[in-house]
UniProtKB/Swiss-Prot annotation:
Disulfide cysteine pairs (residue numbers): none
Residues the entry annotates as binding ATP 1: 117-124
Residue ranges annotated for the 4Fe-4S ferredoxin-type domain, each copy included: 14-44, 53-82
Record: residues binding ATP 2: 380-387
Domain ABC transporter: 77-318, 348-563
GO molecular function: ATP binding; ATP hydrolysis activity; ATPase-coupled transmembrane transporter activity; oxidoreductase activity
UniProt organism field: Methanocaldococcus jannaschii (strain ATCC 43067 / DSM 2661 / JAL-1 / JCM 10045 / NBRC 100440) (Methanococcus jannaschii)
Name the UniProt record assigns to this protein: Uncharacterized ABC transporter ATP-binding protein MJ0719
Record SMART domains: AAA
GO cellular component: ATP-binding cassette (ABC) transporter complex
Family listed: Belongs to the ABC transporter superfamily.
Superkingdom to which the source organism belongs: Archaea
């Protein structure tokens, strides 16, 4: 079994990667050059770029000693060894010397091809190349990239014909981009007018109904929420006639019902490539899977195409069996948790039936209790009152009727749904203001699993959405509290980050005997962490009704019945899988009233 990376020395290609956002030559003594053995012997292993004033490392002259990695005060340098089969002539695209490199490409085909991988591994780059927005440079920076070289490179493969069509404008590609929040900056107008303008199929009314867009047709794009923008972007892509469609993270901002509505619509298209971090949605959507692995921001490798079940399972195991490559040291396995009778444990918090009116929205919640060490997952559509309920528990707002009863001096820690980077200082400053972060326990339980080591010296205001989310989760869980309230902790996180966060939440609940309320739309995430469910139903934006905490099976069954989605559990990994609508298993489970998973 070959280890895909984490190697130094030997007969293989070496990558020297510099994070130029972290590199600050004006604030250091150029330790990378000062201590480099090659430079000290008079070689040009590291030189200063005249334009940027920042170092450039020669991957040919670099010996791979790793001294610059250890000496750099800003942790900006990585030296990574690759297996010899990943030689320089296997590079499909490079963003420059000492920058990200992509090996391999996804093969478009009829049906839906899904791509799974960490953030920063090159998934969006693959989509841009296949959509004709970026001509791959094959790792050559000394001349402008052109399709003739690309066609020659892929000669004899399925991609040769595809790039020939791209060159001759013979492929009409429709691309739904990842960051839909930028759309109001480049497109102006009302939703209905914009969708009618791009409708080339005469399916405007059908799409409006399927994606539940009727109530926002008269609104300006600039007035829409993230979830509304996402649905409009998906609708606009679907309504256009194309030879191939690309969807980059279509489930972001959407609730569970909206995710499956979008997935059903996307599956109607003939040829699709989709990037998605919600494993259940990806499984439901796709006919084939490509795994992308490597080192984020350094290099990414595209696997051969695989069947959906095999592809997702191999990703979770961290092992490509046909290629005989292991790319992750530890597999991700969803152990079945024993059902615990929490009623034998002390009560942390209880609440009576509560009512709250906010403007035109009315919320009613049945009473309930949370016990020590219990995690309660909160399920329901957007705009149904889940966040309002969490705010009632946190004491951020008061109920109009009813009360929250804390048993003794109970402390509550709350991570809100929408996080604003309004802290002046570094991540280390923020976390240190809450607790002592320089202990071995904190490093092993929070810093390492949430991958915060390289963020500690970063300014909070400069963090991306996913980075800010991980810091906010760490801040919430670092507080000395008895109950933790987390609103959509999986938002902006990739597959592996979501699974790490779920394990951190579960471990803290078990070890500290803390109570947890978790709102999230990722069913796999909720299935892993939760002991019981609270289910919200109603009419979004008008009224919401929250149940009392229910056992996991009954709660999930109630929720999925409302969604008209059935689940089974994969026998190999234990992960929940959504049945394809209308399949034999889907029909059988609906007839039995068993919407939650059954074993295969």
């Amino acid at each position: 079994m070959k280890l895909g990376f984490y190697l130094l020395g030997g007969d293989f290609m070496r990558l020297a990667i510099i994070d130029y956002d972290r590199c600050q030559p004006k604030k250091c003594s150029m330790e990378c050059m000062k201590y480099c053995p090659g430079v000290r012997m008079g070689e040009k292993t590291i030189e200063i770029d005249e334009n940027t004033g920042k170092p450039v490392i020669s991957e040919v002259l670099c010996s791979g000693c790793g001294i610059c990695v250890k000496r750099c005060p800003f942790k900006a340098i990585s030296i990574i060894g690759l297996p010899e089969e990943l030689s320089e002539d296997k590079i499909v695209h490079s963003y420059g010397q000492n920058r990200f490199k992509l090996f391999g490409l996804v093969i478009p085909r009829d049906g839906v091809v899904g791509i799974i991988g960490q953030n920063g591994i090159g998934k969006s780059t693959v989509l841009r190349i296949l959509a004709g927005e970026l001509i791959p440079n094959l790792g050559k920076h000394d001349k402008e990239p052109n399709y003739d070289d690309v066609i020659k490179y892929f000669r004899g493969t399925e991609l040769q014909e595809y790039f020939e069509k791209l060159k001759n404008k013979g492929v009409k590609a429709i691309h739904k981009v990842q960051y839909v929040d930028i759309l109001p900056k480049v497109v102006k107008g009302k939703v209905g007018d914009l969708l009618k303008k791009v409708d080339e199929k005469g399916k405007f009314d059908e799409v409006v109904e399927k994606l539940e867009l009727k109530n926002i047709l008269d609104r300006e794009l600039s007035q829409l929420s993230g979830g509304e923008l996402q649905r409009v972007a998906i609708a606009a892509a679907y309504l256009r006639n194309g030879d191939i469609y690309f969807f980059d993270e279509p489930s972001s901002w959407l609730d569970i019902r909206q995710r499956f509505n979008a997935a059903r619509l996307i599956r109607e298209l003939n040829k699709v490539v989709v990037v998605e971090h919600d494993l259940i949605v990806l499984d439901y959507l796709s006919d084939y899977i490509h795994i992308m692995y490597g080192v984020p921001s350094a290099y990414g490798i595209v696997s051969m195409p695989k069947s959906v079940r095999v592809g997702i399972n191999e990703y979770l195991y961290g092992e490509l069996r046909e290629e005989n490559i292991r790319f992750r040291k530890e597999p991700i396995i969803f152990e079945k948790r024993a059902v615990i009778d929490f009623k034998n444990r002390p009560i942390l918090l209880s609440y009576s039936s509560m009512k709250k009116t906010l403007g035109d929205f009315k919320l009613e919640v049945s009473g309930g209790t949370i016990y020590k060490g219990e995690v309660i997952g909160i399920l329901g559509p957007n705009g149904i009152g889940k966040t309002t309920f969490v705010k009632l528990l946190a004491g951020v707002i008061k109920p109009d009727e009813g009360e929250v009863i804390k048993e003794g001096d109970i402390k509550v820690s709350y991570k809100p749904q929408y996080i604003t980077p309004d802290y002046d200082g570094t991540v280390e400053d923020l976390l240190s203001s809450i607790t002592n972060i320089h202990t071995s326990y904190y490093k092993s339980e929070i810093i390492n699993p949430l991958q915060l080591e390289k963020l500690l010296d970063r300014e909070v205001r400069e963090l991306s959405g996913g980075e800010l989310q991980r810091v906010a989760i760490a801040a919430c869980l670092s507080r000395d509290a008895d109950i933790y309230l987390l609103d959509e902790p999986s938002a902006f996180l990739d597959v592996e980050q979501r699974l790490r966060v779920s394990k951190v939440i579960r471990r803290i609940a078990d070890e500290k005997e803390a109570g947890m309320f978790v709102v999230d739309h990722d069913i796999l995430f909720q299935d892993y962490i939760s002991d019981r469910f609270i289910v919200f139903s109603g009419e979004p934006g008008k009224f919401g009704v929250g149940s009392s905490p229910m056992n996991k099976r009954d709660g999930a069954n109630k929720f999925l019945k409302e969604m008209q989605i059935t689940f089974r559990r994969d026998p190999e990994t234990g992960r929940p899988r959504a049945n394809k609508e209308g399949s034999q298993r889907d029909i059988m489970q609906k007839e039995k009233g068993e919407y939650y998973y059954v074993d295969e």
